[in-house]
A protein has these predicted regions:
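Short functional linear segments
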Residues: 1-46, 53-66, 71-73, 107-114
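ATP-dependent carboxylate-amine ligase catalytic core
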Residues: 29-30, 34-37, 63-156
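Hydrophobic alpha-helical packing residues
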Residues: 57-62, 131, 270, 350, ...
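Beta-strand->loop->alpha-helix junctions that form or flank phosphate-binding loops
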Residues: 72, 198-199, 211-233, 250-254, ...
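Acidic, Mg2+-coordinating active-site environments of NTP-dependent enzymes
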Residues: 109-111, 134-142, 158-243, 260, ...
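Nucleotide phosphate-binding/pyrophosphate-handling subdomain across enzymes
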Residues: 133, 138-143, 149-162, 166-170, ...
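C-terminal helical cap/extension that packs against the catalytic core
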Residues: 201-220, 235, 303-306, 312, ...
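Glycine/aspartate-rich loop-and-adjacent alpha/beta segment that forms the canonical ThDP
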Residues: 419-437
Length: 437
């Protein structure tokens, strides 16, 4: 099986639909010899910040000498970045080899009358099998959706259950209220593991703490108020947090204060469990961490930022970052959103301060809110100084935004936001401009 054939096979699986619960992936993993049972996990759930916490934590562990697997969703640059070891993506040949083994297992299951796994279940099984074959010391694992019934939650050997910020998202899918969403996500806590959480709303905190205590888990909450910022701009910050002094980080944005404090508390929890993680590894890991689509700077003149803010909480933090870093600059937004998100709130938070807004269709045609409908939503809250354009393509939006940003000596910043799903195309389209300004 070639890589192309493996991707085609995976794409074809989406037509089979899905069966709720973990029985299907358990059956697949059993057919593969339960590779997840030979691995140790740091399992991360949350609404916003999971990816950044994963990036910091896994890079620090790699710098400390632990062979560290990463499983992330969604991806930004390449499909292959979904499965990584020490920051290196799985290769096309490795992907094809693992997929062939999984296809054979699925064929055997289907012959027994078992259901076909979902795409995400197959990807998760691939990751477990790959990490076992590569003999990873630890795997930092990001949930796909929710927690308790998420395909990643088949694992048993959770060393640390981690919660990034939990807020309202995927209403009606994993819960109808914030409390129900938090309860679902708390399902990743396993008996006796350590639990680390971001600073949560009080009702969420009570749910997580109660679940942790019921399973005899030590519960630790990050304290972002103990972080002192020494230097900061749109390219990163220098900070101190508790005993970690003068640390450098190259992912900017308001939300990174919270994410950094969570990651450092995870590292402290692991140290208490006997993992050898020196301060130098923490320093080197933070300095080396890059995470595409999280307030990522593509250009400095003009400033071009891509950020995956896709819900109300993320939009508020993006707005705070914009106000902090770009006071006095004209704001140009490129925006694409999914129609099943609370996009009106994203628009109401971000768009009133913009000079121009270019709306686009997302690559996923089934879920995208059409650019024209998004433009209509923007017009409902536009000011007299704002212009709104529904573009035919992401490339057109990038070209027009960049041209306007550079047409005279005015200070302007371009921000592409609304979803992670189209940022790879923004990055690709922008490359020709920023390489030859």
């Amino acid at each position: 099986m070639t890589y192309k054939e493996a991707r085609v096979y995976l794409d074809e699986m989406s037509k089979y639909g899905s069966v709720l619960g973990l029985d299907t992936i358990r059956g697949l993993l059993r057919e593969l010899g339960n590779p997840q049972d030979d691995l140790k996990f740091i399992h991360i759930a949350g609404t916003n910040g999971k990816g950044s916490v994963l990036a910091y934590t896994s890079m620090i562990l790699s710098k400390a000498g632990y062979k560290t697997g990463r499983y992330v969703s969604p991806t930004v640059i390449s499909y292959l970045e979904k499965i990584q070891i020490d920051g290196k993506w799985i290769s096309e040949s490795e992907f094809a080899e693992i997929m062939e083994e999984i296809k054979e297992a699925i064929d055997r299951l289907v012959c027994k009358g078992e259901p076909v796994p979902t795409v995400f279940e197959v990807e998760t099984a691939m990751a477990f099998l790959y990490f076992k074959k590569q003999k990873c010391d630890l795997v930092v694992l990001e949930t796909g959706l929710g927690g308790e019934t998420d395909a990643t939650n088949v694992i048993k050997n959770t060393v640390c259950a981690v919660f990034a910020t939990i807020s309202v998202d995927h209403l009606g899918v994993i819960g109808d209220t914030l409390e129900e969403i938090a309860q679902t996500k708390s399902g990743i806590i396993k008996p006796g593991c350590t639990v680390v959480s971001a600073r949560q709303q009080e009702n969420v905190r009570l749910i997580l703490r109660k679940k942790a205590e019921s399973l005899n888990c030590i519960y630790t909450e990050a304290e972002p108020e103990q972080m002192s910022i020494e230097e900061e701009d749109y390219k990163g910050l220098t900070f101190s947090y508790k005993k970690y002094m003068h640390m450098q980080n190259h992912i900017a944005g308001e939300c990174q204060r919270e994410n950094l404090s969570v990651a450092l508390e995870v590292i402290e929890s692991l140290r208490k469990l006997g993992y050898q993680i020196e301060e130098g590894a923490v320093r080197d890991g933070l300095d080396a961490t890059r995470w595409a689509g999280r307030f990522t700077c593509l250009s400095e003149d003009p400033v071009v930022i891509v950020d995956g803010a896709h819900n109300e909480d993320a939009a508020k933090k993006l707005k705070t970052s914009i106000e902090r870093y770009f006071t006095g600059e004209e704001l140009i937004l490129i925006m694409g959103v999914f129609k099943d998100k609370e996009y009106e709130k994203i628009v109401q938070i971000l768009c009133p301060s913009a000079k121009r807004v270019y709306t686009v269709d997302l690559p996923n045609k089934e879920r995208t809110l059409p650019a024209e409908k998004l433009a209509e939503c923007v017009r409902d809250c536009m000011t007299e100084q704002m212009s709104v354009y529904a573009e035919k393509s992401i490339g057109d939006a990038v070209a027009k935004a960049y041209t306007y940003a550079t047409e005279d000596s005015g200070k302007r910043a371009v921000i592409a936001c609304g979803s992670l799903s189209y940022l790879s195309e923004v990055i690709r389209c922008m490359e020709g401009y920023v390489q030859n300004p």
